[in-house]
């Protein structure tokens, strides 16, 4: 039941549309790398020669969640192309399971492949991931040497550390009881769903990246404690930046500090991709 609870994807509806921000956009479809699921999203073009950012949302969210379209509009103003898409099992994309980033990394790799087919320079593609999307972004970058820029918001360091917390949220079991079931749940996740929870360790994957990353985390995050983000930052290449925001919750940093958020994110990607 724990394995089912933490892999269940709640398919939500879009909460915003690029047209609300007077943005030019295209409805797009593409496939994950290695699979035939259809992923759907929006591509916001500026110029093929401009850097392109791929937004990767968290579990239970959608491409437009957490004010993503507003953030995208601010980055389009700063001459970035943006691709927002629904991960498998979310929004309008195919699939019915979430995997904490394990299979979602293939979705991110598929988004990269889609941009390459458009003619985007592979060395001018950056990833910005939120919560589970942060995990998927780090894992994808570790598998794709052409990526050299990743920003993560509310990232976890090791999935095993969060299984009990997430299981208590997603199942009827009390938080003190769920740790007792974790070993069996790991075996079930591997045997039934093909998810190797032991490999969902972004702090290990980020250490394989040969470039600095930007890590953003709210100190008041009750879902993924800020110390998890600190571990990711500590494991990343020298020169990585950790931005901690007091009294800010899970994936709320842009909502609470929109102007500074845009400046920090755009400056990071400008330095890495231009």
Predicted stretch roles:
Residues 139-195, 204:
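Hydrolase active-site cap/lid region
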């Amino acid at each position: 039941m724990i394995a089912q609870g933490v892999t269940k994807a709640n398919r939500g509806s879009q909460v915003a549309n690029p047209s609300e921000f007077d943005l030019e956009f295209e409805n797009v479809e593409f496939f994950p790398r290695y699979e035939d699921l259809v992923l759907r999203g929006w591509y916001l073009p500026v110029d093929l020669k401009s850097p392109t950012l791929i937004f990767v949302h968290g579990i239970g969210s959608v491409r437009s969640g957490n004010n993503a379209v507003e953030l995208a509009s601010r980055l389009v103003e700063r001459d970035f192309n943006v691709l927002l898409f629904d991960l498998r099992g979310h929004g309008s994309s195919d699939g019915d399971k979430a995997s904490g980033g394990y299979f979602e990394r293939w979705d991110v790799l598929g988004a990269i492949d889609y941009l390459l087919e458009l003619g985007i320079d592979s060395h001018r593609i950056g990833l910005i991931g939120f919560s589970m999307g942060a995990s998927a972004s780090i894992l994808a970058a570790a598998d794709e040497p052409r990526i050299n820029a990743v920003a993560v918001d509310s990232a976890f360091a090791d999935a095993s550390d969060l299984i009990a917390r997430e299981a208590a949220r997603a199942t009827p079991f009390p938080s003190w009881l769920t740790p007792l079931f974790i070993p069996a749940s790991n075996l079930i996740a591997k045997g039934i769903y093909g998810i190797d929870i032991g490999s969902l360790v972004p702090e290990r994957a980020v250490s394989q990246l040969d470039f600095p990353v930007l890590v953003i985390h709210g100190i008041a995050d009750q879902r993924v404690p800020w110390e998890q983000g600190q571990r990711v930052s500590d494991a990343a290449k020298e020169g990585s930046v950790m931005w901690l925001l007091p009294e800010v919750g899970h994936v709320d940093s842009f909502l609470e500090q929109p102007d500074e958020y845009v400046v920090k994110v755009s400056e990071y990607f400008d330095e890495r991709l231009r």
